[in-house]
């Protein structure tokens, strides 16, 4: 009789462990899905950051070019004005 009770207890424990195991598998599966979604979001954000970086580089080049053009125009215009005033005298 005692052996049957022990067997029943062991069977109940085994059934409980199987249930807990299934629950843990479901939790792990849910965490994997969340992790996959987060990885995808990170990849999307990295792509957007790369595009922003490319646009920023283009803007910096444009501004640098505009500054160089303005300085060159000022120097050339000043030189022409000086030469013109020298020729007038």
Curated annotation (Swiss-Prot):
Q: Which UniProt keywords apply?
A: Cell membrane, Membrane, Transmembrane, Transmembrane helix
Bilayer-spanning residue ranges: 63-83
> Where in or outside the cell?
Cell membrane
What protein does this entry describe? Protein XhlA
Q: Which InterPro entries match?
A: Haemolysin_XhlA
- State the similarity comment: To B.licheniformis xpaF1 and xpaL1.
Job description of the protein: Associated with cell lysis upon induction of PbsX.
Coiled-coil ranges (or none) = none
Membrane topology per the entry is: Single-pass membrane protein
Gene name tied to this protein: xhlA
Q: Does the keyword Repeat apply?
A: no
Per the UniProt entry, what species is this protein from, by scientific name? Answer: Bacillus subtilis (strain 168)
Q: What is its main location?
A: membrane
Name the Pfam families for this protein.
Answer: XhlA
* One Gene Ontology cellular component: plasma membrane
């Amino acid at each position: 009789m005692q052996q049957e009770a022990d067997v029943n207890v062991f069977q109940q424990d085994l059934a409980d462990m199987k249930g807990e195991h299934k629950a843990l598998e479901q939790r792990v599966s849910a965490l994997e899905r969340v992790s996959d979604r987060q990885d995808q979001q990170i990849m999307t954000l990295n792509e957007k950051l790369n595009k922003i970086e490319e646009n920023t580089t283009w803007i910096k080049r444009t501004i640098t070019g505009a500054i160089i053009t303005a300085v060159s125009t000022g120097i050339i215009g000043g030189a022409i004005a000086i030469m013109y005033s020298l020729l007038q005298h």
